[in-house]
């Protein structure tokens, strides 16, 4: 039987948003259900994000989490969650000026 990763094992390198890949940083506003989230992105738009099956089973998402989001490029404002950042990774993103601290506080204050 295969062993799962330990709780304190390293996850590898933290992926960053890339304009070449089309990814952007978003904050979970609401958990809709059935594997979907409503996310507020750094461009000010609200999108409907789908959680892929491999993440749905292993990574729990809740309101206020910062995620890396890949829009599908269609007009209906939908896309897919690529990665969920941990608390220390969010602090690094704020320090690197990739994520506005006001956006994080705005969503945290609305809860």
Swiss-Prot record:
Chain ranges passing through the membrane? none
Protein biosynthesis listed as a keyword: yes
Does the record bear Protein biosynthesis in its keywords?
yes
Q: Any idea which UniProt keywords this protein has?
A: Initiation factor, Protein biosynthesis
CDD domains, alphabetized:
S1_IF1A
Domain S1-like span(s) in chain numbering:
12-86
Matching entries from SUPFAM superfamilies are given as: Nucleic acid-binding proteins (SSF50249)
Q: Which GO terms describe its molecular function?
A: RNA binding; translation initiation factor activity
Function per UniProt: Seems to be required for maximal rate of protein biosynthesis. Enhances ribosome dissociation into subunits and stabilizes the binding of the initiator Met-tRNA(I) to 40 S ribosomal subunits.
Q: What is this protein called?
A: Translation initiation factor 1A
Q: Which organism is it from?
A: Aeropyrum pernix (strain ATCC 700893 / DSM 11879 / JCM 9820 / NBRC 100138 / K1)
């Amino acid at each position: 039987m295969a062993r799962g990763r330990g709780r304190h094992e390293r996850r590898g390198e933290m992926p960053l948003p890339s304009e070449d890949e089309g990814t952007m940083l978003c904050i979970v506003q609401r958990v809709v259900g059935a594997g979907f989230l409503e996310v507020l992105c750094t461009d000010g738009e609200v999108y409907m994000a789908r959680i892929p099956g491999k993440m749905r089973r292993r990574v729990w998402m809740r309101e206020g989490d910062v995620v890396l989001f890949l829009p599908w490029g269609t007009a209906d404002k939908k896309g897919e969650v690529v990665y969920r950042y941990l608390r220390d990774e969010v602090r690094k993103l704020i320090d690197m000026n990739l994520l506005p601290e006001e956006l994080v506080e705005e969503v945290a204050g609305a809860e």
